[in-house]
């Protein structure tokens, strides 16, 4: 995980300088955008167009091969009709550049990219109808199936076996769970970790493999109006958590994040599953693991947000967006139990398919 010392902290003047030097563009408008570990800026050059300058934290900037593959994946998806960002080449034809900056902790190297800006509203800001939830599930499954078609000599770098946000890394949460000391929810978190090890890990060989986006959340999905009361997905953002994984991981992550802002979170799973299965039907082992994998993602979000706030207390408001509400959802799902939650999800999915 990145730390406070690795997060970039570029000034307005540094942004305008790097945009001019690397891309030959004069930034007439620059404004910061929210980010968990990195630094993002909206940039509107006087020459025209709209972009996002993405400055990776210095820890992740060491993984050049991973970020290069993420960038190529975005281009691949865009070429196949999915609403992903693309990277603008530098004046020397590179899709990324390693730059030195002193952000208060000595000179460090940060990886910089200029990505196309996708207009739209994050799904977190709208009330999601069952139809848009269905579309989200369908889009998540489509993304994973399209990425299976991508050929690249370095796909092995996406194994990322100890990447803390991978769902296979749930046992690694034991290193961080101490940040929950004194919180009664810690007992639930420990219980979920144990259930993952006992009930999910033995089924991993039965899951279908793919490349996961890994962060299909309500702040990384953009929508735009499609008629008087409808929306359609207009953008998929932030591929920084891409890794080799399993189809069922993407679905679990998607359901968890779509629950966060929902006034009726238990009603989210059904439409998302229905949309997902319209592209990629689940097998028995995947269906049987979905509840625990959703719970695992809630635990990751809660524990890692608490840990990161200790590193970045000034960023607490943004870091805790998901985990504050996720705390209630995690407790409620635990209280209801696997059988009842799965019954609601799969029954609702079946009913949605019959509409």
From Swiss-Prot:
UniProt enzyme class: transferase
Family in the record: Belongs to the aminoglycoside phosphotransferase family.
Active-site residues per Swiss-Prot or TrEMBL entry: 215
Enzyme Commission code: 2.7.1.81
Compartments in which it is found: Cytoplasm
Descriptive protein name: Hydroxylysine kinase
Alphabetized InterPro entries for the sequence: Aminoglycoside_PTrfase (IPR002575), Kinase-like_dom_sf (IPR011009), Pseudomonas-type_ThrB (IPR050249)
A Pfam entry, by short name: APH
SUPFAM superfamilies, per the entry: Protein kinase-like (PK-like)
Main localisation: cytoplasm
Catalyzed reactions: (5R)-5-hydroxy-L-lysine + GTP = (5R)-5-phosphooxy-L-lysine + GDP + H(+)
Free-text function comment from the UniProt entry: Catalyzes the GTP-dependent phosphorylation of 5-hydroxy-L-lysine.
Coiled coil: none
The gene coding this protein: hykk
GO cellular component term of the entry, any: cytoplasm
Single GO molecular function: hydroxylysine kinase activity
Keywords recorded for this protein, A-Z: Cytoplasm, Kinase, Transferase
Gene3D superfamilies, sorted: 3.90.1200.10
Segment forming the signal sequence: none
């Amino acid at each position: 995980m990145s730390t406070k010392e690795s997060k970039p902290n570029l000034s307005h003047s540094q942004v305008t300088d790097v945009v001019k030097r690397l891309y030959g563009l004069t930034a007439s408008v620059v404004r910061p955008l929210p980010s968990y570990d990195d630094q993002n800026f909206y940039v509107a050059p006087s020459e025209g167009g709209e972009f996002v300058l993405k400055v990776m934290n210095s820890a992740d900037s060491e993984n050049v091969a991973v970020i290069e593959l993420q960038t190529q994946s975005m281009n691949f998806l865009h070429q196949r009709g999915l609403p992903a960002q693309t990277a603008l080449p530098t004046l020397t034809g590179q899709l990324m550049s390693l730059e030195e900056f002193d952000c208060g902790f000595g000179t460090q190297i940060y990886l910089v990219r200029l990505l196309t800006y996708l207009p739209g509203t994050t799904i977190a800001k709208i009330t999601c109808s069952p139809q848009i939830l269905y579309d989200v599930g369908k889009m998540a499954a489509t993304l994973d199936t399209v990425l299976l078609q991508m050929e690249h000599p370095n796909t092995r770098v996406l194994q990322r076996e100890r990447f803390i946000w991978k769902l296979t890394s749930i046992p690694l949460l034991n290193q961080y769970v101490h940040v929950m000391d004194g919180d009664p929810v810690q007992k639930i978190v420990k219980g979920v970790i144990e259930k993952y090890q006992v009930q999910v890990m033995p089924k991993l060989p039965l899951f279908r493999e793919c490349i996961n986006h890994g962060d299909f959340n309500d702040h990384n999905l953009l929508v735009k109006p499609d008629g008087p009361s409808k929306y359609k997905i207009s953008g998929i953002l932030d591929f920084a958590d891409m890794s080799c994984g399993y189809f069922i991981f993407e679905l679990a992550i998607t359901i968890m994040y779509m629950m966060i802002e929902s006034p009726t979170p238990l009603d989210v799973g059904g439409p998302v599953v229905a949309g997902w299965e319209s592209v990629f039907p689940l097998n028995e082992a995947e269906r049987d693991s979905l509840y625990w994998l959703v719970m695992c993602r809630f635990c990751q979000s809660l524990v890692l947000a608490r840990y990161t706030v200790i590193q970045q207390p000034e960023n607490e408001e943004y870091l805790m967006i998901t985990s504050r509400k996720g705390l209630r959802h995690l407790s409620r799902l635990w209280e209801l139990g696997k059988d009842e939650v799965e019954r609601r999800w799969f029954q609702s999915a079946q009913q949605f398919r019959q509409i």
